[in-house]
């Protein structure tokens, strides 16, 4: 009941302050897990009230509301997200949009702008990337600006903060004798950087959807805005690559901040594989060596680059670039490890990208000079394992095609002479190829039937 009455309190009144303090106490106590539907609806009402305060007030309560909103909405996989998505009214979304505009457009300390950008990331996480470019307005809201200006405002604000953080983190890591920052301060900057990277990744996805015509009908973003956004993203990715170059120059290849940098580079190059081509080509071998804090060997750094690799290897030059430093071995190793993820389902999307990359290289192996080596035996076993987890024709045919290409490099006698490959594995390989041929025959028969049926 309190939340529904807040909108009736006079702006800046003592009642608003007291209500806000009460909500602050609740926010730090409440957890949405295992809540009843009624209580979740109450939390959703709290979010609605906080969104209104965040939008319309210009006192300290505005920023308290911002902090409470980010605390509530940043909880991962919270049932509250579902309750908010099912709300019939979108006014709360527009209030949050208005509050974000107000914070980003005015002279506000960097920490509050970071909170506003975190809130934007939370909204895109809960409601989808297209939230940023949907045309929502609230009557009598002076903070309303066009969708295009809002998209660019959020992106440019994020870009500025990323540039500052990259510089500060690099200085604290590589100029430690001149830096007075504590480890906690550096860790906080790295966490903030990860949040901003996540926001920019979502913007990349939104821009990609809008430019390809796959966005929601409510998107009204203009082509000129898309081009401005792409120009800005190019500049930011170039800065991220410079950050990675600094790490390479200082012999640093382990760290979650470096892995996060690789991830955002991979996300952008998935959409524009030849952007920043010179810097990327120079750094690709180093990127493949980067490890997260909890990794004992590189894995995710290669996996994040697979969408780009599957595209550049369609050309002979791209294949030569990858093979020149043994990058194809890293891709094969990544594929093998994806089939060994204990307790988790195999990510078919990443597997297809890895297979496409290897198939592209194998197709151009005469120009790439790829000899038969033991790691190909491990690749065969991984493909057999992958195909054995499903009846999906796409998996069976892709795995079979790549196995066949590998076998063209060698002979049955050589394969059986390898200690890790026995007659049982060879039978499994034969069964896979037979399954693939049955799939081809089935599709051929169906195609013939449909063709004849069309002439009937």
Regions found by a protein language model. Give the residues of each.
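Long, acidic and serine/threonine-rich low-complexity regions
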Residues: 435-438
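Blade-edge beta-strand/turn elements of extracellular beta-propeller
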Residues: 49-50, 99-102
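Short, surface-exposed polybasic-aromatic patches that bind anionic ligands, especially phosphate groups
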Residues: 383
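Non-membrane alpha-helical segments in proteins
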Residues: 1, 21, 191-202, 260-267
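Alpha-helical repeat/alpha-solenoid scaffolds of the HEAT/ARM/MIF4G superfamily
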Residues: 124-250
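A eukaryote-biased sequence property
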Residues: 259-263, 303, 307, 311, ...
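Elongated alpha-helical scaffolds that mediate protein-protein interactions in large eukaryotic proteins
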Residues: 1-48, 54-67, 73-95, 109-114, ...
């Amino acid at each position: 009941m309190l939340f529904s009455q807040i909108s009736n309190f006079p702006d800046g009144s003592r009642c608003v302050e007291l209500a806000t303090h009460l909500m602050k106490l609740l926010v730090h106590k409440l957890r949405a897990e295992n809540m009843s539907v009624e209580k979740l609806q109450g939390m959703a009402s709290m979010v609605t009230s906080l969104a209104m305060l965040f939008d319309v007030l210009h006192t300290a309560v505005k920023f308290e509301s911002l902090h409470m909103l980010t605390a509530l909405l940043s909880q991962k996989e919270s049932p509250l997200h579902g309750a908010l998505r099912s709300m019939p009214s979108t006014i709360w979304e527009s209030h949050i949009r208005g509050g974000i505009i107000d914070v980003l457009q005015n002279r506000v300390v960097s920490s509050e702008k970071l909170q506003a950008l975190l809130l934007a990331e939370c909204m895109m996480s809960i409601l989808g990337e297209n939230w940023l470019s949907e045309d929502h307005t609230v009557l009598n809201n002076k903070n309303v600006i066009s969708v295009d200006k809002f998209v660019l405002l959020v992106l440019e604000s994020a870009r500025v903060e990323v540039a500052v953080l990259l510089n500060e983190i690099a200085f604290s890591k590589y100029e430690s004798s001149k830096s007075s920052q504590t480890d906690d301060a550096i860790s906080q900057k790295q966490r903030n950087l990860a949040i901003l990277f996540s926001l920019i990744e979502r913007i990349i996805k939104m821009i990609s959807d809008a430019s390809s015509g796959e966005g929601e009908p409510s998107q009204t973003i203009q082509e000129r805005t898309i081009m401005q956004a792409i120009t800005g993203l190019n500049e930011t990715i170039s800065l991220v690559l410079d950050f990675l170059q600094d790490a390479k120059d200082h012999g640093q290849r382990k760290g979650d901040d470096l892995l996060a940098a690789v991830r955002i580079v991979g996300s952008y190059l998935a959409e524009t594989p030849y952007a920043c081509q010179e810097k990327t080509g120079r750094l690709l071998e180093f990127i493949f060596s980067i490890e997260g804090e909890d990794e004992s060997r590189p894995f995710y750094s290669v996996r994040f680059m697979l969408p780009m690799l599957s595209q550049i290897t369609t050309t002979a030059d791209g294949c030569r670039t990858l093979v020149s430093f043994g990058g194809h071995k890293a891709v094969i190793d990544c594929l093998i490890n994806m089939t060994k993820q204990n307790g988790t389902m195999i990510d078919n999307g990443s597997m297809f990208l890895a297979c496409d990359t290897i198939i592209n290289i194998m197709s151009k192996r005469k120009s790439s000079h790829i000899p038969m080596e033991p790691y190909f035996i491990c690749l065969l076993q991984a493909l057999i394992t992958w195909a054995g987890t499903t009846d999906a024709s796409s998996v069976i045919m892709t795995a079979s095609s790549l196995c066949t290409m590998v076998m063209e490099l060698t002979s049955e006698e050589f394969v059986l002479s390898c200690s890790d490959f026995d007659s049982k594995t060879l039978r499994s390989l034969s069964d896979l190829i037979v399954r693939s041929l049955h799939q081809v025959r089935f599709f051929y028969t169906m195609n013939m039937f449909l063709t004849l049926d069309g002439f009937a």
